[in-house]
């Protein structure tokens, strides 16, 4: 008999069929307590779990005594209790490589749209304000040859640095847990402490996962150290930034503009002050949101679960020592 798995995110038909070729697949709408209670027998027998955007915590794991692996359709896994999974010897798989280039594209789009005020001036045109040749109140700022500070030089940071260095001749500063020799050799990137990066960068791009150490890493103190002309970009995780401090920095003119793909609470509240600011470009966590990349992520997650339940954890595993 095939192992039983629970799918809590819709898949394209071909990927669902791939999953069904290996497992008995039970589809549920979400992982809410109500759903778990209504499908208690299914959860009790499931050996695998696949989906995204739901919390997987110790309380859920108590209801899934046979669970051996969970696969998320994402690179981030801050919604998983990794300690609880590891304590129960449950593998956690994710999709770290599939979305790199697409998220870097999104970051570069935020850099360009904030600097050149693309969203703001497009709305002014639609509102009928373009009635004569434009003047300085429509102007943006250059991107080329401006200094880009990258906080978090992982795969996505490297892909962004490549675009900025070769495409826009931007000097690159970076801050990370360790020196990145390849970034320094390929892009002439310069490692520096966070304070130096904040003080010298024209654009500050935050690309960090959410951990206990990175929560609210950016607050009033950090924004106060940035140039008043600086543009701040966040496409990592929303809670890495103290959103109230960001709002205050924008309102006080401590920084110039923000381009945001992630927020402390998602979806962003309709009454958030960020939505009424002309100097904010806010998009709904679209970092990896292309048809091609989302399909690739789903395919990777399916293959990850198949591999994990077959004892193959050579790649894409957050806690591979569980398999030892």
Curated annotation (Swiss-Prot):
PANTHER family: 2-HYDROXYACID DEHYDROGENASE-RELATED, GLYOXYLATE_HYDROXYPYRUVATE REDUCTASE B. Catalyzes the NADPH-dependent reduction of glyoxylate and hydroxypyruvate into glycolate and glycerate, respectively. This is Glyoxylate/hydroxypyruvate reductase B. It comes from the Bacteria. Belongs to the D-isomer specific 2-hydroxyacid dehydrogenase family. GhrB subfamily. It is an enzyme of class 1 (oxidoreductase). Its main location: cytoplasm. The active site is at residues 237, 266, 285. The gene is ghrB. Its EC number is 1.1.1.79, 1.1.1.81.
């Amino acid at each position: 008999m095939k192992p039983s798995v629970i799918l809590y995110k819709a898949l394209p038909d071909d990927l669902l069929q791939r999953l069904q070729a290996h497992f008995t697949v039970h589809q549920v709408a979400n992982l809410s307590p109500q759903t778990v209670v209504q499908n208690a027998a299914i959860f009790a027998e499931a050996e695998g779990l696949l989906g995204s955007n739901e919390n997987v915590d110790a309380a859920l794991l108590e209801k899934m005594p046979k669970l051996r692996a969970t696969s998320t359709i994402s690179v981030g896994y801050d919604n998983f209790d990794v300690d609880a999974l590891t304590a129960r010897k449950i593998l956690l798989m994710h999709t770290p490589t599939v979305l790199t280039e697409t998220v870097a594209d999104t970051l570069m789009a935020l850099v360009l749209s904030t600097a050149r005020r693309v969203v703001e001036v497009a709305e002014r045109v639609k509102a009928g304000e373009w009635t004569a040749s434009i003047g300085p109140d429509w102007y943006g700022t250059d991107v080329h040859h401006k200094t880009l500070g990258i906080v978090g030089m992982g795969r996505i940071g490297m892909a962004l640095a490549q675009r900025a260095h070769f495409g826009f001749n931007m000097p690159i500063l970076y801050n990370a847990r360790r020196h990145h020799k390849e970034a320094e050799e390929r892009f002439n990137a310069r490692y520096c402490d966070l304070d130096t990066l904040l003080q010298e960068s024209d654009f500050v791009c935050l690309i960090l996962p959410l951990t206990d150490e990175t929560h609210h890493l950016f607050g009033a103190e950090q924004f106060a150290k940035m140039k008043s002309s600086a543009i701040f970009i966040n496409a990592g995780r929303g809670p890495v930034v103290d959103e109230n401090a960001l709002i205050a920095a924008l309102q006080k003119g401590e920084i110039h503009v923000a381009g945001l793909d992630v927020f402390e609470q998602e979806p962003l509240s309709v009454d958030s002050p960020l939505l009424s600011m002309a100097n904010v470009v806010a998009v709904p966590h679209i970092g990896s949101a292309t048809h091609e990349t989302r399909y690739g992520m789903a395919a990777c997650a399916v293959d990850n679960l198949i591999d994990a339940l077959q004892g193959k954890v050579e790649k894409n595993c957050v806690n591979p020592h569980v398999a030892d």
